[in-house]
Amino acid sequence: MVKQQGSGKTNLANEDEAYEAIFGGEFGSLEIGSYIGGDEGANSKDYTEHLPDAVDFEDEDELADDDDDLPEESDANLHPAMMTMGAYDDVNENGAVLGIDSNSLNMQLPEINGDLSQQFILEDDGGTPATSNALFMGMDANEIHLATETGVLDGSGANEIGHSQLSIGGVNGNDMSINGGFIMEPDMSDGKHKKATKLDLINHEKYLLKKYFPDFEKGKILKWNKLIYRRSVPYHWHSEISRVKKPFMPLNLKFKVQQDDKRLFNSRTISYVAPIYQGKNNLLQSNSSASRRGLIHVSIDELFPIKEQQKKRKIIHDEKTISEDLLIATDDWDQEKIINQGTSSTATLADSSMTPNLKFSGGYKLKSLIEDVAEDWQWDEDMIIDAKLKESKHAELNMNDEKLLLMIEKTNNLAQQKQQLDSSNLILPLNETILQQKFNLSNDDKYQILKKTHQTKVRSTISNLNIQHSQPAINLQSPFYKVAVPRYQLRHFHRENFGSHIRPGTKIVFSKLKARKRKRDKGKDVKESFSTSQDLTIGDTAPVYLMEYSEQTPVALSKFGMANKLINYYRKANEQDTLRPKLPVGETHVLGVQDKSPFWNFGFVEPGHIVPTLYNNMIRAPVFKHDISGTDFLLTKSSGFGISNRFYLRNINHLFTVGQTFPVEEIPGPNSRKVTSMKATRLKMIIYRILNHNHSKAISIDPIAKHFPDQDYGQNRQKVKEFMKYQRDGPEKGLWRLKDDEKLLDNEAVKSLITPEQISQVESMSQGLQFQEDNEAYNFDSKLKSLEENLLPWNITKNFINSTQMRAMIQIHGVGDPTGCGEGFSFLKTSMKGGFVKSGSPSSNNNSSNKKGTNTHSYNVAQQQKAYDEEIAKTWYTHTKSLSISNPFEEMTNPDEINQTNKHVKTDRDDKKILKIVRKKRDENGIIQRQTIFIRDPRVIQGYIKIKEQDKEDVNKLLEEDTSKINNLEELEKQKKLLQLELANLEKSQQRRAARQNSKRNGGATRTENSVDNGSDLAGVTDGKAARNKGKNTTRRCATCGQIGHIRTNKSCPMYSSKDNPASPK
């Protein structure tokens, strides 16, 4: 609490005693008036002695009020800890602060102990300049400390002031001094309390240091980059690639363009300008007496009745006038006369007799000039100062006035304009619409509607993109591009066995991947980036794209080093669509609304959608991206350059599934001229390269034969003889040189003879040819053989390309579907004259049954084309949906469970025949039992037939051999046994043949006997029907009754109505 000082006994005349009294706490309320007297004399009771340098504090209440008017300054000078407490609403008489929640105060200052009676204490260290400031209410606000009963809070680290505490305020009550919410309490003079206060201050400073600078260590420099908050701002050159910027496209573009002043000045059209005042002479007169409609002509005399001299002035309200400012601005000023104080050009031209008629750009003649009136230029300074200028002689309209709505009339009445135009002002129409109206004799503008609704040009699919191959592919580098591919590679086309060249028990050690940076390939062509085969290895850190084909045998596949592009085709949603979306992988190509599909008529790119596509010069196919499992890695093997196998284990960057491939070019056939000429060209390429490396320009056949292992010496010699000449004598005897008319091509010209795509197509043809040979050797089903031949590469590519040109139709569905479940296209050819049948229709199984024998059309062309297009769309979207599924693969829990996907596998033969095998087997009692087995699986039946045919071939070989040459006794016994078996079979066949002839001969007797055995009831029917069949010689036997001469569907059968006959009516 603050002690109140009464009338002290201290002698204030002494300066030292006065200061001791002040710092001793006797001036608690700062009522210095009790010590220092007022206006009354020294003899008064209330007289107080003043210090020599005392300051008057009478107006301290007014000063406090003035300080309240400066909230910003007071808030700025407060301590930060005080700022968090908020403004004090009120203070009661007991000094309690009102409007402050204790909970909120404790939250803001957790380190301060005590109740709500927290006070602000001023301390003095005794030696700081702040001592006098604190005394005379001029202390710095930063020196204010927040204190409790036990300690002092100093957020700014200020020094202590004095040994005692002062209370600031002008209101005393209950031993408290309150001013603006600041409550001051005198400090105790106890030494222990001071030490505790200093200790609390030190602890609080350590707490603040640990809170705001947790990484602070004594003797180390702080890392201000981590402590100071920095706002993350992108660089000005940085652009987000993933974010698709939406372009700003206003729908209604209407720009108001101001007319060019130069054109208006030089034009001959009528302009709307301000009128010109005239003096004694007329300044301008209208060439036309007609006035515009809607204008009321009022003279100045009616508006302003002024002096006679001013009455002579008239306002010419004509639309063909020129403003005065414009005349002055465009006049030719005589600078010499102006500088020499001569007569101005305007004054000189005032005389109409000396002035010739002037023509302006509008075509009007100026008959008189403006008369310079001296009265208009005589201004009185007093009138200007007193704002008593004379009134304006005409109304002034400010075009920029917001309260005025000015509209310019635009008359489209051509007849009225023609009347106003004089014969001297007739000019040629310069407007484009007027010129078109003059020559618009056939109403050409009416035909413009057809041009708007009809699009004259539709882009025929994106032009062929440029595909750049690597240097090894362009060079057709061996052994990657062989002239003759071995059979084992053709049978495993692009599916080489990974462990074929690895010895069993080999220890695999993974090598480290080679680092390949993007800077190395930046700005380079494909030839430069992949100049050698080492650059094409997968054993580096370059990203890898795995393309898994959905077909078992694609139409054509790229070889080593050939380039492919991943194109993201995007079709515009409408004509105003300017969006160009970009996927993380691939090159974006935008298709117009009317552009054709990149898949011709067998695929679709919907408006506003993206279809990623694998693009090269041989095929096009849609691709579908899939997520890669975190447990999947790629194991690769690399060999070459005299180094053993090296193994690499790396992650997979991108995984795609390739849909059905659509061929771009036709695969040549085995005996086509294209293949024959390519073989000859390939031979020339090899010879040219050998000659370019040989200085003598002569070679032998041996280095050429290495590239053609399937040809002998004579075949190579015959082909080389076409363009080379054999040297029979001379130093080059036995060698071959080019003929005189043959030119040796350099290596660059040799590379252009054959492209890598042609080599890939020939290899695809070779693979199909090898498959055909294997099919003929191991496939015994004639129907399946013919189907496989129709599905060879050169057949299906020809069918597809003809169908894209609308010269043929393909089946779309059926046995030629590579998926086997209706999710792919069948490229088998079908007839365009009613041959196409929609899937699921009953006529799709047997097309020949619906064909009519007449010459009339049994189909509708429009309906067939509609069904054809619908089937294409159905197959395309089914194909897309199936390959887009990203469900994880589920292993079969029960391997014996029937898989529903095998429902299309045949379980019966087409001819409905089964195999019956009768085997003799002894049972457990030693008795021979007959065991009959029926086999219906066509594949098992085919296997048995193949074994039987093989045994027959072995028998024939054994029988053809001469017995005299057989030295082995076992072979003789085997041959004897085979001969006996063959003889028994021949005897059985002879007996069956004889029995068949006897049955034909005795057919009548047999029929009679059978009729008697069947009973008397059936005999009457038989006899009645027999008369009808008399004279017919037939050998047909009924399956129900066994009689000859009819079948079971014939009503003449005696058992036709019996239950055993399946043909009988039920």
Swiss-Prot record:
GO terms for biological process: positive regulation of transcription by RNA polymerase II; RNA polymerase II preinitiation complex assembly; transcription by RNA polymerase II. Residues 409-425, 944-1000 form a coiled coil. Its main location: nucleus. Residues 836-856, 989-1036 are annotated as: Disordered. GO terms for cellular component: cytosol; nucleus; transcription factor TFIID complex. Pfam families: DUF3591 (PF12157), zf-CCHC_6 (PF15288). The keyword tRNA-binding does not apply. Present with 1500 molecules/cell in log phase SD medium. Belongs to the TAF1 family. The 1.2 MDa TFIID complex is composed of TATA binding protein (TBP) and the 14 TBP-associated factors. One copy of each TAF1, TAF2, TAF3, TAF7, TAF8, TAF11, TAF13, two copies of each TAF4, TAF5, TAF6, TAF9, TAF10, TAF12, and three copies of TAF14. This is Transcription initiation factor TFIID subunit 1. It comes from Saccharomyces cerevisiae (strain ATCC 204508 / S288c). The gene is TAF1.
